[in-house]
């Protein structure tokens, strides 16, 4: 068991090293898109399932509250939080529509959808992306493996942050790090700090 635990740490470290080579440009581009979205008076909607829903909530909390510096709240909504809305849509229509219907109501041109799925094949996240595109929103996707069906929906205006791994747990670990990098870039671009302070 101890060896298995050590192997998990080693795999996680190696995946992060691989990601540190593969992802900085896409993370930086996504952060810049988010900064421009927020400067334009728009908001960021986020969605995912399971651990990815938790990541969507984590991202939203960092923007609404703060990441590492004191600053005003920034507009972000995790679409996985309203259980009454989610269960009503799932019951009356289908689980695949729990995010898309919210986006049709809340999404505006210029908003960003942060779509999170380790496989890139989550049906409700794909429907969310389709709804976002119909609302003239931009998409930042956090995926892994081969990017799944989500990769095929992205245009040159969108950004995919695809973790170079096929292991769900390792992908989730890098997703959290990527979210922290996004938050850090957003904060430091919108609210520059004296690095020596």
Curated annotation (Swiss-Prot):
Binding of substrate, residues: 49-51, 62, 91-92, 117-119, 122, 172
Pathway: Carbohydrate biosynthesis; D-glycero-D-manno-heptose 7-phosphate biosynthesis; D-glycero-alpha-D-manno-heptose 7-phosphate and D-glycero-beta-D-manno-heptose 7-phosphate from sedoheptulose 7-phosphate: step 1/1
The family this protein is said to belong to: Belongs to the SIS family. GmhA subfamily.
Note: The reaction produces a racemic mixture of D-glycero-alpha-D-manno-heptose 7-phosphate and D-glycero-beta-D-manno-heptose 7-phosphate.
Gene that this sequence comes from: gmhA
Record's catalysed reaction(s): 2 D-sedoheptulose 7-phosphate = D-glycero-alpha-D-manno-heptose 7-phosphate + D-glycero-beta-D-manno-heptose 7-phosphate
Protein's name according to its UniProt entry: Phosphoheptose isomerase
Keywords on record: Carbohydrate metabolism, Cytoplasm, Isomerase, Metal-binding, Zinc
């Amino acid at each position: 068991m101890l060896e298995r635990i050590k192997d998990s740490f080693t795999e996680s470290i190696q995946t992060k090293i691989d990601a540190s080579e593969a992802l900085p440009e896409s993370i930086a581009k996504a952060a810049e898109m988010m900064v421009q979205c927020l400067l334009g008076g728009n908001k960021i909607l986020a969605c995912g399932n399971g651990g990815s829903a938790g990541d969507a909530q984590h991202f939203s909390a960092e923007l609404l509250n703060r990441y590492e510096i004191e600053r005003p709240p920034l507009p972000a909504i995790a679409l996985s939080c309203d259980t009454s809305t989610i269960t009503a849509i799932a019951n009356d229509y289908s689980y695949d529509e729990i995010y898309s219907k919210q986006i049709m109501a809340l999404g505006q041109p210029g908003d960003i959808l942060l779509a999170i799925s380790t496989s890139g094949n989550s049906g409700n996240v794909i429907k969310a992306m389709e709804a976002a595109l119909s609302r003239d929103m931009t998409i930042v996707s956090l995926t892994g493996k081969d990017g799944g069906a989500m990769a095929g929906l992205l245009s040159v205006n969108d950004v995919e942050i695809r973790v170079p791994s096929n292991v769900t747990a390792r992908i989730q670990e890098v997703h959290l790090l990527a979210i922290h990098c996004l938050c850090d870039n957003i904060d430091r671009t919108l609210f520059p700090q004296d690095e020596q302070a």
